[in-house]
Amino acid sequence: MSSKVIITIFGASGDLAQRKLYPSLFRLYKSGNLSKHFAVIGTARRPWSKEYFESVVVESISDLADSAEQAQEFASHFFYQSHDVQDTEHYIELRKLQNKLNDQYQAENNKLFFLSMAPQFFGTIAKHLKSEQIVDGKGFERLIVEKPFGTDLATASKLNEDLLATFDEEQIFRIDHYLGKEMIQKIFAIRFANLLFENVWNRQYIDNVQITFAEKLGVEERGGYYDQSGALRDMVQNHTLQLLSLLAMDKPKSFTKDDIRAEKAKVFERLVQPSKEDLKRFFIRGQYKSGKINGRKYISYRSEPNVNPESTTETFASGAFFIDSDRFRDVPFFFRTGKRLTKKGTHVNIVFKQMDSIFGEPLKPNVLTIYIQPTEGISLSLNGKEVGELFNLAPISLDYRTDATASGASPDPYEKLIFDVLNNDSTNFSHWDEVKASWELIDRIEELWSQNQVPLHEYPVGSMGPEASFELLAQFGASWQWQPDKE
């Protein structure tokens, strides 16, 4: 890995940069993964000075630094340029600053660009980086872009085309912070390093897979953005389908980025494109209505600030995906994601097929649960015997949870992903083929929903979504394993 690099952050005054990027860069610096041969150029429209920018950086890492001196030494590597992304003259000044810092920090012409801005500016920035020779083929040149990567296949394709005019596919890192989470990356270990699971990870033994992304909060201050996006675009097109690909892929030939990508790509290629009838049967949308939780009243989605009072945007999405592969043909991959649900949490449940009863005693299916957030860990439910003289069965659970100390020591997702980019490891990033396939599927669902050909189910705040989501699983003789509203 080369830690000799000039990092340029477009959108350096924004919330993401201050909450995530500067702390993540500091952790890399503190651990020695960023050497003294680095500098960060922050650009944004605000007319900040270098001194003020340094103070913003110091404030963002105040809880992480061992001393004020350490924080200030780190911040001294940060430089600021007020920048209008559509003004060519500003790129000329940026090139001059880049060249100066490259010489000052002996960065060997290595460049990393992070676009922490609205996607409509990505193409403009990439075009100017090339035309003003900031991207010049010297050293490594890598680009990190934030989601959302388009709003449908057409916009994503145009965005990709614009980036490819300056960068090669192998230089583009489409970030999905969920893929940087420690427990997501442990899925490989759970699956492929344990004979117990690897030999039964198929349709012969697995009845269904359940993926839940639950949020307790509403849309908060994101009403304007969310009303143009909705749960399907915001959570399913990226996080859900990326997680599904890790759960459904075959074992790669090796654990190199190319072999892992190849197996993930096969999952996206084999996603079944549902018919119009299946779209109506197997995909559910919902929107939270007003209500009370523990005596406190919460407003409906349509009453949220910056939301259309007649909005049909979904705050809840649920459905069943299928994969036409030898491993998982006919196995439903259920998903649900929503706002204002009972409890915040991201869980995966692998529900194994139910065995026949023994001695007249009904058996519950074995379930492997992968906890991704807020706690991390796994549990495996088994059928055991109650203590006593009679042969009565009772469920038992084998649990492993990461304690708070260990969780705190795990790399932040952005820290891990920036480290991967510096190491030129694109394993935990979305390749264009994956993005394209996911949008093709999401567009089919969105087309039907935008025409209001399926009901928009209301659900009470504090629930786990509309009843239709539970009825969906009942069609397959299944039920949601995680039901915190009944705990």
Show which residues each predicted segment covers.
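Secretory/organelle targeting and membrane-embedding segments
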Residues: 1-145, 149-487
